[in-house]
Amino acid sequence: LFGKQRKELSTSAITTLKGGYVKNVPNLNPFNTITGLLPGLIMIQNNGEPGEEGGSMYLRGQRTLGNNTPWVLVDGIQRNLDILDPDEIESISILKDAAATAIYGLRGSNGVILVTTKRGKNQKIQIGLDARVAMQSPTKLPEFLGSYDYARLYNEALINDGQQPYYTQEALDHYYFKDDPIHYPDNDYLDQYLKKHSIQQKYNLSVRGGNNIAKYYFLVGYASNSGLYNVDKINTYGTNATMKTYSVRSNVDVQVNKNFDIRLDLSGRMQ
């Protein structure tokens, strides 16, 4: 079913993105890391909750089958793209036209996304440690009037319509001087409910190597996002929209003889 062909001899619409580009994007979710990097792939994020940033994907617009989502294959097995650790991705290829997706039949009618994870190489053992810390903050928040400006402009609008002002001068003075917050509150709820930024952390430890007989690649990872909600500590349980993820990947290739190979791929994710 699968084979190799020189790129210059291929006439199909195929675009490939190397894993290095995915790794260098400071994001914890592969769904967001490839946004804008693959021509023809449209990504629509439907959720901003940490760890749930996935959404809808379309290849060259909407197609005909089911929910129009491309078929995602990770090492030849159907998987969700957002359960992968970006560091374990070797390459991502998208098959966009009928010539490229013909071997997948009806399942490929919406396009196909092929993800290849990293594997061992015939080399000395290579140990890698990747640690990243970043700050995440809201890009744009609405700006609301304070209580005094709202009351003043509300009175002005009523006067312009030939009506009596709703707020008295005494009330306006209280709003202005903020001397009676119980009866004349002036709260900035966005400032109270949201933090200025959240801390995002990501740590990965990988081991890669092999020889002529066996090749291996192992990865363990941890990622977290502290969340943007400004919560207190009165509860024994967490009330913030946070995320903690533990992931593991193990790819082992063993060549028993020249006609018989064994490949064992294991992956897990807990969130």
Please provide the spans of the model-predicted regions.
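Cationic-aromatic interfacial patches
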Residues: 266
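Short, intrinsically disordered, charge-balanced linker/junction segments flanking boundaries
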Residues: 270-271
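Short, small/polar-rich motifs associated with maturation and membrane association
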Residues: 1-250, 254-257, 261-263
